Regions:
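Conserved Lys-Pro-Asp/Glu-containing loop-to-beta segment of HAD-superfamily phosphomonoesterases
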Residues: 4, 139-170
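Conserved H-loop
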Residues: 34, 123-128, 156, 199-202
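Substrate-recognition element of Asp-dependent hydrolases with the DxDx(T/V) motif
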Residues: 89-118
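N-terminal helical cap/lid subdomain that shapes the substrate entry/recognition surface
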Residues: 2-91, 95, 110
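Acidic, Mg2+-coordinating phosphoryl-transfer loop and its flanking beta/alpha structural elements
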Residues: 161-201
Length: 220
């Protein structure tokens, strides 16, 4: 029986792509690079901000880029429209909390920015635990971040469900031995997600209520 539902953050619960795009292009401009399209930047997120910088400026300039990106991104997240909850998310979180499920977040974002987002959107109180790559033994797609959350909350793998929007999330859950629901609201396409054969697939977060509410979790 599922007792804990762990969520990825970006593309799963929130849309912060506008803020990410602004900060990436600001950083690129400061370093003399041409701006990149919103679509290209969106496709490149998921591995954490250092990997994002490496992707656009290379390993040699990554640390310099981070020193520019992070202060700008902290401000960009606070701007109107910089980050928002994806459709249906708030209702699903409140529904699950009301049903007695423990909720957690596993994100490759740094803890600082994750907490900025959750506080701004007034949903931090809904989560029993938030664990990010900078505080985990290894980032996704390595399984340690999911194991650490389950262990901290005294639960077994079979009592955990993970929800994410990227192929990296599917692979992370598979390595962890944890059931996974892929949702096509983020960076990976519907085909990319389905090709990896996650335990379940949904096209919008509100559909998660049916999976959990109908007790399909314990029946599968």
């Amino acid at each position: 029986m599922i007792k804990l539902i762990i969520f990825d953050l970006d593309g799963t619960l929130v849309d912060a792509y506008q803020a990410v795009g602004q900060s990436v292009n600001y950083t690129l401009g400061r370093l003399g690079f041409a701006p990149r399209s919103h679509a290209e930047i969106k496709r490149s997120v998921g591995g954490g901000d250092r990997k994002l910088m490496v992707h656009f400026v290379g390993e040699k300039l990554a640390d310099q880029a981070l020193a520019i990106y992070r202060p700008h991104h902290a401000k960009a997240l606070g701007l109107t429209g910089g980050v928002r909850l994806l459709p249906g998310v708030l209702g699903v979180l409140k529904f699950l909390k009301g049903k007695g499920y423990k909720l957690a977040i596993a994100s490759n974002r740094p803890t600082k920015f994750t907490r900025i987002i959750l506080k701004k959107l007034d949903v931090l109180f809904l989560f029993n635990m938030v664990l990010c790559a900078d505080k985990a033994e290894k980032p996704k797609p390595y399984p340690e971040i999911l194991w650490a959350i389950a262990k901290r909350l005294n639960l077994k793998n079979e009592e955990v469900l993970y929800v994410g929007d990227m192929t990296i999330d599917v692979n992370c859950a598979r390595r962890a031995g944890i059931r996974m629901v892929a949702v096509s609201t983020g960076s990976s396409s519907k085909k990319e997600l389905k090709d990896l054969k996650p335990w379940a697939f949904i096209s919008k977060m509100s559909s998660l209520k049916a999976i959990v509410g109908a007790d399909l979790v314990s029946a599968r």
